[in-house]
């Protein structure tokens, strides 16, 4: 071995000893790759560190364990190409243990046999051939690395500029700290002169000149670039300008930081645009909570939208309405609902209503299908959808008969039924000599309201006699119709209904139903299954009930109060 390494190198080597212990442990776990690099760095620190490293590795190589020998040989083989030249020179002078490892042998392992001994001998032969090879490139000698001093004010390299106020990192420039400080002051003076000097390129002189002796404060270049004049902005930049207003519950008291800037005086011009952009950004998160809002608030939000803010909604409506088929497929409907959840649902609904006017029948049908999907989704309240769509759907329903008219009427009835609104169900009398039509409860399927000025295609089979709440003498139970009697008595009359009816029964039937009505039971309630009874209801009450019924029908109908207070207004 060479001379004994100094004490400082030995103490420094003790800090790296845990790395070496982990890399040469006596187990079958391979040495991690990053430890090879850490061990190679030890050989480059100093000559004493290389001597200590080689001494430790040779001591571990002299161990009787095959796992330790194999790990040490692999580390030495890595250091032949990545270690320092001084380490390679010392290793060549102390290669006796490497020669002994080429003949390493022992009792075979019960499980692995002689495989470990063979690996150690092969690694020792590779290390010897690499170590004494003539073609081995000599690694460049690296000077010992000087660790940078730690502490306040320490510099990573000598003769560097002082770090602090006015410090600029320039690796190419060299000079004293005084020269660096003077150059910093000179550059700052140039910036101030360029900002104050009038010129065509000065951004401060692009504004209007002061009139008379009016005071105009100087504006630094950073402030002018930060707050440009809104009049010179592009439309896209104007749309992104936020309005300055108080927002309760926000950080900083809810006031924007632009209140003290020169551009805050123009904030009132962009308040509508910012309100529209806020409504668009909140449509995805507030869509599911819209049922708790009033329709009036939603209408005010819809009025504050600008046309330029609805470009994504317009593209979605064009994609939905322009398709090869008349109806929307399930995939198209699901994609439409998903996109609406991310956009402004109110704007999409208004654009769909605009597509119902002046477009082809196919586009109208696809737009109606999209509107119908709003009714089945939880994007907007049903009351708000009905408020926006009622006028357009009524105009379409009043048009010429066709699929568009039927679809619009169906959607309107569905929305009215979902909102619980009672729409009128009065029908004109079929005969001029008959009594007034009896008012029955609203039935969505059997009593549709025909559009004004159009022909009635579907008519209810019969009207239901409902006695309103009025001070009219109640008929006796013997004269009540089957619809108003007890269910047990009605069942008894149906069993005994084989008797022929009288002339008065026929007259009463004519006063209640139209001539073309073929219902066998005029007193049955309006139902989808009317006319499908197995037993004909031909037994009618006594003639004395006709006079009482006429008295009842002459009184104005009194609607039953609803359980919802807002429907009784």
From Swiss-Prot:
Annotated stretches, region: Disordered: 196-298, 467-524
Annotated region (Interaction with AP4B1), positions in chain: 525-535
Pfam families linked: ENTH (PF01417)
Low complexity: compositionally biased ranges: 260-292
Membrane topology: Peripheral membrane protein
Cellular component GO terms held in the UniProt record: coated vesicle membrane; cytoplasm; cytosol; organelle membrane; trans-Golgi network membrane
Biased composition (Basic and acidic residues): 506-515
Record flagged with keyword Cell division: no
Bias (Polar residues) ranges: 219-229, 494-505
Localization terms from the record: Golgi apparatus, trans-Golgi network membrane; Cytoplasmic vesicle; Cytoplasm, Cytosol
Bias type Pro residues, positions: 470-480
Location of region: Interaction with AP4E1: 559-569
CDD domains the record matches: ENTH_like_Tepsin
Molecular function via GO: protein-containing complex binding
Predominant location category: Golgi
Keywords annotated in UniProt: Cytoplasm, Cytoplasmic vesicle, Golgi apparatus, Membrane, Phosphoprotein
PTM-bearing positions, type Phosphoserine: 400
Boundaries of every ENTH domain copy: 8-141
The keyword Lipid metabolism is annotated on this UniProt entry: no
Described function: Associates with the adapter-like complex 4 (AP-4) and may therefore play a role in vesicular trafficking of proteins at the trans-Golgi network.
UniProt subunit comment: Interacts with AP4B1 and AP4E1; the interaction is direct and mediates the association of TEPSIN with the adapter-like complex 4 (AP-4), a heterotetramer composed of AP4B1, AP4E1, AP4M1 and AP4S1.
Protein name: AP-4 complex accessory subunit Tepsin
